[in-house]
Amino acid sequence: TNQWYAIAKIAGIKLCQAYRRQHGNDFISAMPTNLYGPGDNYDLASSHVIPALIRKAHEAKASGASQMIIWGSGSPRREFLHADDCADALVHILKTYSEDQHINVGSGADLTILELAQLIADVVGFHGQIVHDLTKPDGTPRKLMSGDRLAALGWRPGISLREGLAGAYRDFLTGDARGNVA
């Protein structure tokens, strides 16, 4: 998301590599893509894109609104992975990978924020218009990781984006009991 976050991730990778080389431990750095799933944060002030869009679509549907507003142009592309798939991938990596280089954990597919908003609106059942707030930032044009190392190990995600979003929406609907919905 920002320069300092990226620097911290790189520092963590380098620390694992150095510790592995110095002490002979089988440390592996796994770099996950954007994750979503059960127990997510649906507070619009602090949530990431998927839970924010789920909440916006739900509130638009529940209030009978004719439109749902999304940030920016909708053109940036993002990759997403369900948290359960990430956990599965990490177990697979622990069983099949022992290299010095970090390994990316992702779906290998991306879509635009507008396509994501349309998919979420469909899953939620909101049939109104999606409107762009061009006063809000787009962010980086594209974030898609290379999943070649993980694919070579024979791992593929098991949860489609639509299926995962439907599960996330079910989680949102029951989340207020856990305090996840502000």
PLM region descriptions:
Residues C16, K56, A117:
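Aromatic/hydrophobic pocket-lining residues that form π-stacking "cages" and hydrophobic walls in ligand
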Residues N41, A45, S73:
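Active-site "substrate specificity/gating" loop of NAD(P)-dependent dehydrogenases
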Residues I13-P38, P51-L53, A62, Q67-I69:
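Conserved beta-loop-beta element that borders a ligand/cofactor-binding pocket
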Residues W4, A8-A11:
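Active-site helix of classical SDR
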Residues N2-W4, A18, L44:
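Active-site loop-to-helix junction immediately N-terminal to the catalytic Tyr of the SDR YXXXK motif
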Residues P38-N41, R149:
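Short beta-loop-alpha junction of Rossmann-like oxidoreductase domains
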Residues E59-A182:
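C-terminal substrate-binding subdomain of Rossmann-fold SDR/epimerase-dehydratase oxidoreductases
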